Regions:
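Conserved catalytic core of the tyrosine transesterase superfamily
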Residues: 1-329
Length: 329
């Protein structure tokens, strides 16, 4: 699926089309990833059901807050995006426009993601199982957390799944048009299959969400990523006895993806895989376009570190892979 300025819509369509054309006239190359980010902002702003384009402080804060729990680079990009659009609207004479202050935009250069140990992941699963035994609302999280760790999928990818995307005949999940416009197939084992059958909307229509929002009915709404991320930080981690702070940054549910990728790579090497062969396989599993993106993405445990680094250097020297992973995760 190709995303262009023709995809902009609603009362903000003129704003976004004009913004892209203005930036391009200055020599900026607006590729797919930038347009996709603006389209997400367009979709968010249209939820306010306005008659004319405005940008209030509450709207800007809400846009940024919905990404709480995601990578600092994602939040940084969202803050920069909402500020730039606000500046453009202000300069074009739109009324009631809030410009997000530059001083509030976070610097992410010193960020290092958190890697959960196997023991910590076991504590997380135990914690959510206890919570689920006390309250039915946590049943979804029993499946969601196991799905995230078993597949290294992104939270948004799991919540975007439709009933037709989970094939219980072949035990394969299809992730459609994810980040970098990549579609991929992810196999799952019998253990995860049981959880998917228990926690998913297996009786829904093919185009229904596999994890629909509570009381969604026929509205077609899915669960909100923000709600999942916040509950993980504020409820599940404390219940598991894990400090939510990793230095000056909070541990995020997205760190399960990092941890899963590291565990997969370590396991493949333990099975005797050549690291050179393992990295491309893992890159495909994660939905990356290039091997370099996978190497940068992983924060490896000490086991096999030298082997992986040497393999990565070999790959770069051979000129394989493209560093085309989006800045925001």
């Amino acid at each position: 699926m190709s995303i262009t300025i023709e995809n902009f819509h609603g009362v903000f369509r003129e704003v976004f089309v004009g913004y892209v054309e203005y930036k391009r006239s200055l020599g900026f190359a607006f590729d797919y990833t930038i347009i996709a980010g603006l389209l997400k902002l367009n979709n968010y702003l249209e939820t306010y059901d306005l008659n004319a384009p405005i940008l209030t402080r509450e709207m800007a804060k809400g846009y940024i807050h919905q990404n709480e729990g995601k990578a600092p680079s994602t939040i940084h990009n969202c803050e920069s995006r909402i500020r730039q659009v606000g500046l453009y609207m202000k300069n074009m004479g739109y009324e009631n426009v809030y410009v997000y202050p530059e001083k509030h935009i976070k610097n992410t250069t010193d960020f290092v993601p958190y890697i959960f140990s196997k023991q910590e992941m076991q504590s997380i699963f135990k914690a959510i199982d206890i919570l689920a035994s006390e309250n039915m609302m946590y049943h979804f999280y029993q499946t969601e957390l196991r799905l995230l760790y078993a597949t290294a999928m992104r939270v948004g990818e799991t919540l975007d799944l439709k009933v037709k995307d989970v094939d219980f005949t072949s035990n394969v999940i299809k992730v459609n048009n994810a980040k970098n416009n990549v579609t991929r197939l992810i196999p799952f084992n019998e253990s995860l299959r049981k959880w998917l059958l228990k926690g998913g909307n297996i009786d829904g229509d093919p185009d229904d969400y596999f994890f629909p929002a509570p009381r969604a009915g026929k509205t077609g709404k899915r669960k909100r990523s923000q709600q999942v991320c916040i509950l993980f930080q504020r409820t599940i981690l404390p219940k598991a006895g894990i400090n939510i702070w990793n230095g000056k940054y909070k541990i995020r549910i997205h760190d399960i993806r990092h941890s899963s990728a590291c565990a997969m790579l370590s396991h493949m090497i333990e099975l005797g895989w050549d690291p050179y062969c393992a990295l491309p396989y893992l890159s495909t599993m994660l939905g990356h376009k290039g091997i370099e993106s996978t190497e940068k993405y992983l924060r490896l445990t000490k086991e096999h570190y030298d082997e992986i680094v040497n393999a990565g250097h070999y790959i770069y020297e051979k000129g394989l892979g493209n560093d085309d992973e989006e800045k925001d995760i």
